[in-house]
UniProtKB/Swiss-Prot annotation:
GO terms for biological process: alanyl-tRNA aminoacylation; negative regulation of DNA-templated transcription. This is Alanine--tRNA ligase. The keyword S-adenosyl-L-methionine does not apply. It is found in: Cytoplasm. Belongs to the class-II aminoacyl-tRNA synthetase family. Transmembrane segments: none annotated. Its main location: cytoplasm. GO terms for molecular function: alanine-tRNA ligase activity; aminoacyl-tRNA deacylase activity; ATP binding; tRNA binding; zinc ion binding. The keyword Isomerase does not apply. PROSITE patterns: AA_TRNA_LIGASE_II_ALA (PS50860). It catalyses: tRNA(Ala) + L-alanine + ATP = L-alanyl-tRNA(Ala) + AMP + diphosphate. It is an enzyme of class 6 (ligase). The lineage of its organism: Bacteria, Pseudomonadati, Pseudomonadota, Alphaproteobacteria, Magnetococcales. HAMAP family: Ala_tRNA_synth_B.
Length: 878
């Protein structure tokens, strides 16, 4: 049974048993800063398990894309060397959210494994947590497994928790026994790490809530989280003891072998490891890029870069000196594109990003390997490579630490992890800051109970800018109150509202809340702390508002309209960027206000003027077409199937709002124009870098764009008036002005040179003799730095033999020293003289034996410095 068939059978089986099929979520977790990547099937359901979100199903089934290559789950160093370690894998899972529990979960899992997949029950054994008598009884009494096939595990291996606190519970796992021809012992034994017994199914019984003191309190509605690795099931069903021998990997291994000119069936063990590494890594690399991650030196992008460069290095071990990984994208698309259409839809982008990174690393790989060879030349087995060298390899040659460790592994040379970490401290602190928590816990303590009590806020703002409502909650200083009085700053929650709460990058509405008694609350901001709760922040201007009061809510219409224009323009610009730059472009963040729009997007280099102009032209073309904005509500799956862009980092419920403006179609809950022509005109203000692999565009449209154009036009008119020309001939006028300036500068240089020549004769009269050598150390005025240098040359020529130091004051000190050829480097060096003189005026300098330059900041010290020069020269002459 091939991998695709197993996946289809799994989903179909649980659909037949009342489970809703939920598509795989992105590898980039939404609204979870604690995770780099989605690493388990339950990640997309975390809010359901925590009780923060409700959906219209209580049973779900999914085949989830997962990556484990950083943080707690870091399988990278073992990939390719063991039978079952992967950076990318698929987790098949069935879930119950307060629906069925242990008995049905065990029964369904056992039935699917033994009946639908046809795995021999005699080959299976299970584990339970040692204190979970309920699960043990179900397995032995209801399923009918003999006691020697149910192993009690006392360790935390069979007790799962989401974190230090929160939902947790015991686990039960199903293991497949490959037989005594494969080394290894059963789970719980000393040699359990062997390959004979492989876990193919894990049932997590979430039945407790762990408090901060460790107390376990039974959950009112226990849940089920099940995980089964597709790659492991494929190995069992295809009679393989190694996942890489299944149909999920073999086409990729053979394609890589063909590129390297080796036979994967007869090659050496180390060559086979390299082929397996490449097959695994092209999967994770391609899926990560397809989900919007680009190579960088921080966060997710850095993990991607590590994986890519490890794959490239193994290609080099196979003799692949030129970029090759990008050529495997086609094979991967043919293998998995039917299930994951993003692989085929983005194949050109995937290949381009991978090849660009391959070329970038190839430029330093050879030099870096040579540096590494030199560094380990004197090391023996058991020695450790120092952290400074490791950091140099990382910082200069782009070698991630684990890549260097992987290279040294075969030589049995270790790495100085602590030393490397010390060198990396500053960079790591920056990366860690990017993954710090979001501070949502304190908000949850206030808003979750409030939402439970008052219910969802109904949003009326798509149609109305004013509405009547009831006040259902009041907040002051972070706590609920009964009333707000004049002068109080606080928050108002109503049962319904036309005010848009900030979300999806769109700022919240402003306006007023008026009460029948004349009281007035000014809304300065509107937030959406939870998906169904809208909170109006502001200040009580007059009167008092009480819980239960009837209120009239009025949005600031002019501000709302300006925000509408910019939000719709953001959609059009996002679509234009993908058309101009490529489908790898994905929104990484946005900010839409009445003043302007800002869009952060994934792209690996700065945009050219031609690209910026093309994007601007496309958006303005869509505006001129004056098409209607269309809105529809559908499931996320239906929306994506229809071609809508889902923005990763946004959380979507069971139904989503799809906004179409011309060719642009996105999942969006924001407010938009009725027709594209309402935006008037669009103008890009700036393009810049935000972080590695992320660019930022700022733009305006409508009235704001017209105001900027008007301001620019007025500035052009004013500049043209100064030059006494027309605005359309301003460039010519500036060219003429610059030409005149250049001519004047040349004339000034000639005058200064002539002046300097005249000054030289006077300076020569100030020369003195020190130890039989002529010395001229004086301050000059009225010249620039260039003239000062010319004067030193002229003095040297006329002096014949001697030492010169000229000082120029002003805002700072400029110094030039000269020594004639007969003395330079023999008895006196200009560089030494400059070091002495510059230090005395609070600066530094240096140069050749015959000429040196320098300067300082202490202008007042010039006379003292000049007085000290004869003594310095006498010391030099001895």
């Amino acid at each position: 049974m091939n991998g695709n068939e197993i996946r289809k059978r799994f989903v179909a089986f649980f659909q037949q048993h009342g489970h809703t099929h939920v598509e795989s979520s992105s590898l980039v977790p939404r609204n979870d800063p604690t995770l780099l990547f989605t690493n388990a099937g339950m990640v997309q359901f975390k809010s359901l398990f925590l009780g923060e979100e409700r959906r219209d199903y209580s049973r779900a089934v999914s085949a989830q894309k997962c990556v484990r290559a950083g943080g707690k789950h870091n399988d990278l160093e073992n990939v390719g060397r063991t039978a079952r370690h992967h950076t990318f894998f698929e987790m098949l899972g069935n879930f119950s959210f307060g629906d069925y529990f242990k008995e049905e979960a065990i029964r369904l899992g056992w039935r699917f494994v033994t009946e639908d997949l046809g795995i021999d029950a005699q080959r299976l054994l299970v584990t339970v947590y040692s204190e979970d008598d309920e699960a043990y009884a179900i397995w032995t009494q209801q399923i009918g497994l003999p006691a020697d096939k149910v192993i009690r595990i006392p360790t935390t291996d069979n007790f799962w928790s989401m974190g230090d606190t929160g939902p947790c519970g015991p686990c039960s796992e199903i293991f497949y026994d490959y037989g005594d021809t494969v080394a290894g012992g059963p789970p719980g034994s000393e040699d359990e790490d062997g390959d004979r017994f492989v876990e193919i199914w894990n049932l997590v019984f979430m039945q407790y809530d762990r408090s901060s003191d460790g107390t376990l309190t039974p959950l009112p509605k226990p849940s089920i989280d099940t995980g089964a690795g597709l790659e492991r099931l494929a190995s069992v069903l295809q009679g393989k003891t190694n996942n890489y021998d299944t149909d999920l990997f073999q086409p990729l291994i053979k394609a890589a072998a063909a590129l390297a000119g080796v036979d994967d069936t007869t090659c050496s063990a180390e060559q086979l490891v390299s082929l397996r590494v490449i097959a695994d890594h092209i999967r994770s690399v391609s899926f990560l890029i397809a989900d919007g991650v680009l190579p960088s030196n921080e966060g997710r992008g850095y993990v991607l870069r590590r994986i890519m460069r490890r794959g490239m290095r193994h290609g080099r071990l196979l003799g692949l000196e030129q970029p090759f990984m990008h050529k495997l994208v086609e094979t991967l698309g043919a293998l998995m594109g039917d299930t994951y259409p993003e692989l085929t839809a983005q194949r050109k982008t995937l290949a381009m990003v991978i090849e660009t990174e391959e070329k970038r690393f190839a430029a330093t790989l050879g030099t870096g390997l040579k540096h590494l060879e030199e560094a380990v030349a004197g090391l023996r087995m058991g020695d450790v490579l120092d952290g400074k060298t490791l950091f140099t390899l990382y910082d200069t040659f782009g070698f991630p630490l684990d890549l260097t460790a992987d290279i040294l592994r075969d030589r049995e040379i270790g790495v100085d992890q602590e030393g490397f970490s010390a060198c990396m401290k500053e960079q790591r602190e920056r990366a860690r800051a990017a993954w710090s928590g979001s501070g949502e816990a304190s908000l949850g303590a206030l808003y979750h109970p409030l939402l439970e009590r008052v219910g969802a806020s109904e949003f009326l703002g798509y149609v109305h800018e004013s509405a009547s409502a009831s006040v259902v909650a009041l907040i002051k200083n972070g706590a609920e109150v009964e009333s707000l009085t004049a002068g109080d700053e606080g928050s108002v929650v109503c049962n319904q509202t036309p005010f848009y709460g900030e979300s999806g990058g769109q700022v919240g509405d402003r306006g007023v809340i008026q009460l029948a008694n004349g009281a007035r609350f000014t809304v300065t901001d509107t937030q959406k702390p939870l998906p169904d709760l809208i909170v109006h922040h502001g200040k009580m201007v007059t009167g008092t508002v009480h819980l239960g009061d009837h209120a009239e809510l009025q949005v600031d219409g002019a501000t709302r309209q300006a925000i509408r224009l910019h939000h719709s323009a953001t959609h059009l610009m996002h679509h234009a960027l993908r058309a101009v730059l490529g489908e790898h472009v994905k929104q990484a963040g946005s900010h839409v206000s009445a003043e302007r729009l800002r869009l952060d997007f994934s792209h690996f280099q700065g945009m050219s003027e031609e690209e910026l102009r093309a994007v601007e032209d496309r958006v303005n073309g869509a505006i001129l077409s004056n098409v209607s904005q269309e809105t529809a509500v559908m499931t996320p799956q239906e929306a994506v199937a229809a071609g809508a862009m889902a923005l990763f980092g946004e959380k979507y419920g069971d139904e989503v709002r799809v906004v179409r403006i011309g060719d642009s179609m996105e999942l969006c809950g924001g407010t938009h124009v009725s027709r594209s022509g309402d935006m008037g005109i669009f103008h890009i203000l700036s393009e810049s870098a935000v972080a590695a692999g992320v660019r930022r565009l700022e733009a305006v449209c409508g009235g704001r764009a017209r105001a900027i154009f008007r301001g620019d036009q007025e500035a052009l008119k004013a500049a043209a008036a100064l030059l006494k020309t027309q605005p359309n001939k301003l460039a010519e006028g500036i060219e003429r002005l610059l030409g005149k300036q250049k001519e004047l500068e040349k004339s000034l240089e000639k005058l200064q040179s002539a002046q300097a020549g005249g000054m030289v004769e006077a300076l020569l009269e100030q020369a003195v003799e020190v130890g039989g050598i002529k010395l001229l150390a004086v301050e000059v005025k009225g010249v620039d730095g260039k003239a000062l240098r010319e004067m030193v040359d002229q003095v040297k020529d006329k002096l014949g033999s001697g030492v010169i130091l000229l000082a120029l004051g002003g805002d700072k000190v400029s110094l030039v020293a000269g020594v004639t050829k007969d003395l330079a480097g023999k008895r006196v060096k200009a560089g030494d003289l400059m070091a002495f003189a510059a230090a005395m005026v609070g600066g530094k300098g240096g140069g050749r034996p015959d000429m040196a330059q320098g300067g300082g900041t202490e202008v007042a010290a010039i006379p003292t410095m000049l007085t000290a020069i004869p003594g310095w020269l006498q010391e030099q002459l001895g």
